Amino acid sequence: MAVFLIAYDLVNERRGTHDYQPLWDELKRLGAHRTQFSLWLVSANNTTAEVRQHFQQFVDSNDRIWVTRLRKSQYDYANAIGGTNNWLSNNPPEA
């Protein structure tokens, strides 16, 4: 399966005008891992566009979503939220 990095800016989160709980529930349902406050890893058999379109339905039209596919040996990080190393070991990005 491909590993995707999903980043978002939830513009209306601070205003309290949108309920983002369904977004977080969907990420958890898919076994995604939160690496930073607004950054998740998810493993899926989809294209980058399909992943973005899927998660777009859980946010407002003015929220921002960025999806990119990780490739083996083509990423690096520091001070990620606990469990990131384990998640990547169990869901290694493809070459």
From Swiss-Prot:
This enzyme's EC code(s): 3.1.-.-
UniProt GO MF annotations: metal ion binding; RNA endonuclease activity
InterPro entries: CRISPR_associated_Cas2 (IPR021127), Virulence_VapD/CRISPR_Cas2 (IPR019199)
Function: CRISPR (clustered regularly interspaced short palindromic repeat), is an adaptive immune system that provides protection against mobile genetic elements (viruses, transposable elements and conjugative plasmids). CRISPR clusters contain sequences complementary to antecedent mobile elements and target invading nucleic acids. CRISPR clusters are transcribed and processed into CRISPR RNA (crRNA). Functions as a ssRNA-specific endoribonuclease. Involved in the integration of spacer DNA into the CRISPR cassette.
Keyword Glycoprotein appears in the UniProt entry: no
Homology family: Belongs to the CRISPR-associated endoribonuclease Cas2 protein family.
Cofactor(s) the protein needs: Mg(2+)
Main EC class the enzyme belongs to: hydrolase
Assembly and binders: Homodimer, forms a heterotetramer with a Cas1 homodimer.
Keywords, ordered alphabetically: Antiviral defense, Endonuclease, Hydrolase, Magnesium, Metal-binding, Nuclease
Annotated SUPFAM superfamilies: TTP0101/SSO1404-like (SSF143430)
Ligand binding (Mg(2+)): 9
Listed name of the protein: CRISPR-associated endoribonuclease Cas2
Organism (species): Methylorubrum extorquens (strain CM4 / NCIMB 13688)
Pfam families from the UniProt entry: CRISPR_Cas2 (PF09827)
Biological process according to GO: defense response to virus; maintenance of CRISPR repeat elements
